[in-house]
């Protein structure tokens, strides 16, 4: 599913409209001296839901970062969604990051699975297994499997996923959104070479997470 509006995420349009109407009403009723705070809030809401276009690396064996944020885990772990041992790389998104998720690789979706759960701080490790989450398992043409998991956080309470099993995905394609801070775990085949380290800031699509 191609996303036709690359500047402001459509998920934010209702919030932007409400903030704009409130700012205008206060401005007309009470003047700028009272409404400036609401205009500032509108600016914050617009920047929060920004969704800029990103350059997409063309390196054939590259796994792209699915989200903006900070790397909080690079480790060997069990991938419960594809039932295998894997290299796990986790990205934590705070409230100031872009909140759309993009496909890390080209492939076909073999499974989309949703799990209800808790709303722990998404930066902690147990959020991967205890929080509300949605897993997308992607099978690549070369036989490799890549799993991308959207995980809700302490404030984020709604995971949006726009793809289904059987559909194709292309690297950098926008496939989901999580509001107000969250986490994305990526599980890669054992032997993949990580290109990021813990604490590093990363950008969706333009940062290479690892090489297969």
Curated annotation (Swiss-Prot):
It comes from Paraburkholderia phytofirmans (strain DSM 17436 / LMG 22146 / PsJN) (Burkholderia phytofirmans). This is Phosphatidylserine decarboxylase proenzyme. The record marks 181-182 as: Cleavage (non-hydrolytic). GO terms for cellular component: plasma membrane. One of its GO terms (molecular function) is phosphatidylserine decarboxylase activity. It comes from the Bacteria. Is synthesized initially as an inactive proenzyme. Formation of the active enzyme involves a self-maturation process in which the active site pyruvoyl group is generated from an internal serine residue via an autocatalytic post-translational modification. Two non-identical subunits are generated from the proenzyme in this reaction, and the pyruvate is formed at the N-terminus of the alpha chain, which is derived from the carboxyl end of the proenzyme. It is a peripheral membrane protein.
């Amino acid at each position: 599913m191609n996303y036709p509006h690359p500047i402001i995420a459509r998920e934010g349009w209702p919030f932007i409209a409400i903030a704009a109407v409130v700012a205008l009403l206060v401005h007309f009723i009470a003047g700028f001296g009272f409404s400036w705070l609401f205009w500032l809030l509108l600016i914050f809401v617009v920047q929060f839901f920004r969704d800029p276009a990103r350059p997409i690396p063309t390196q054939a064996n590259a796994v792209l970062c699915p989200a903006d944020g900070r790397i909080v885990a690079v480790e060997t772990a069990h991938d419960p969604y594809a039932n295998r041992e894997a290299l796990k790389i986790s990205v934590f998104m705070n409230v100031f990051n872009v909140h759309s998720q993009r496909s890390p690789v080209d492939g076909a979706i073999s499974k989309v699975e949703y799990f209800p759960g808790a709303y722990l701080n998404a930066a902690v490790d147990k959020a991967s297994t205890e929080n509300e989450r949605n897993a997308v398992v992607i099978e690549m043409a070369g036989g490799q499997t890549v799993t991308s998991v959207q995980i809700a956080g302490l404030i984020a309470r709604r995971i949006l996923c726009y793809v289904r099993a059987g559909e194709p995905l292309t690297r950098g394609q926008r496939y989901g959104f999580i509001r107000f801070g969250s986490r994305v775990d990526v599980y890669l085949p054992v032997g993949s070479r990580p290109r990021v380290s813990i604490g590093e800031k990363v950008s969706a699509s333009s940062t290479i997470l690892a090489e297969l």
